[in-house]
C-alpha cells in the first residue's frame, strides 16, 4: 500500500484532483466528509461542540450549522484550536478504520485540508500539494461558494501559507490552468505514484 497525503488551500481544486485520482483507481479518504460524519446529530463530538460554543452553532433541526461555527472559529485562533481538538482525533480514528480496509497494493489518497497545520506530513509515503496563487483562491471561492471576499481571505489566513505547503510537498500540482491541463498533470502524477508503489 502507498499512503498519499493530498492537501491544498481553500479553492485550490484539491477535491477535483481527488476525484481524478479516484477515477484512476485510488482509494480516496475524504477528511472533510469524515469530519461531517463525526459531528452528525447524536454523536459525542457534536455534544462537545455545543458544550463549548453554545446552541447558536445548531440549526433548528439540531444539526451543526457549519457556516455559523466557521464565523466564530475562523476569527479566533484559540476557538479554532479547541474545535480541532474535538474533531480531529475522531477523524483520525475513523480514517485508520478505513485505511485498515484497503487491500495490499492499493494507492490510498487521504484528502486532508489541514495536513500542514496539523503536522501530518510524516504519516504519508508521499505528500501532494495542489497549488494556486492566492488571488485565484479568492476568485474561485467567491464565485463558486458565494462567500464574501473578506471571509475567504480570513479562511486563507487561518490556513498554512503556500510556502509552508510547498515546503512539505513531494509532488506539486499547479492547478491554475485549464481542466485539460489538470487531467494531463494528474495522469502524470498517477504514473509517478504507481512507480513509487512498485519500487517499495
UniProtKB/Swiss-Prot annotation:
GO terms for biological process: coenzyme A biosynthetic process. Residues 3-200 form the DPCK domain. Coiled coil: none annotated. It is found in: Cytoplasm. InterPro entries: Depp_CoAkinase, P-loop_NTPase. One of its GO terms (molecular function) is ATP binding. Its EC number is 2.7.1.24. Pathway: Cofactor biosynthesis; coenzyme A biosynthesis; CoA from (R)-pantothenate: step 5/5. PROSITE patterns: DPCK. Keywords: ATP-binding, Coenzyme A biosynthesis, Cytoplasm, Kinase, Nucleotide-binding, Transferase. This is Dephospho-CoA kinase. The lineage of its organism: Bacteria, Bacillati, Actinomycetota, Actinomycetes, Streptosporangiales.
Amino acid at each position: 500500500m502507498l499512503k498519499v497525503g493530498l492537501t491544498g488551500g481553500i479553492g485550490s481544486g484539491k477535491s477535483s484532483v481527488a476525484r481524478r485520482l479516484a477515477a484512476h483507481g485510488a482509494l480516496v479518504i475524504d477528511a472533510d466528509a469524515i469530519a461531517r460524519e463525526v459531528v452528525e446529530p447524536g454523536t459525542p463530538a457534536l455534544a462537545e461542540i455545543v458544550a463549548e460554543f453554545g446552541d447558536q452553532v445548531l440549526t433548528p433541526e439540531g444539526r451543526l450549522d457549519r457556516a455559523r461555527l466557521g464565523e466564530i472559529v475562523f476569527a479566533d485562533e484559540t476557538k479554532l484550536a479547541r474545535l480541532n481538538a474535538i474533531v480531529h482525533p475522531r477523524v483520525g480514528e475513523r480514517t485508520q478504520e478505513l485505511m485498515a480496509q484497503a487491500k495490499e497494493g492499493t494507492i490510498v489518497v487521504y484528502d486532508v485540508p489541514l495536513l500542514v497545520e496539523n503536522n501530518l506530513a510524516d504519516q504519508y509515503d508521499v505528500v501532494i500539494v495542489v497549488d494556486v496563487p492566492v488571488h485565484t483562491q479568492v476568485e474561485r471561492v467567491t464565485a463558486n461558494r458565494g462567500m464574501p471576499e473578506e471571509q475567504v481571505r480570513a479562511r486563507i489566513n487561518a490556513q498554512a501559507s503556500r510556502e509552508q505547503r510547498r515546503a512539505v510537498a513531494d509532488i506539486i500540482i499547479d492547478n491554475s490552468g485549464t481542466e485539460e491541463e489538470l487531467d494531463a498533470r494528474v495522469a502524470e502524477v498517477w504514473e509517478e505514484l504507481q512507480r513509487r508503489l512498485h519500487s517499495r
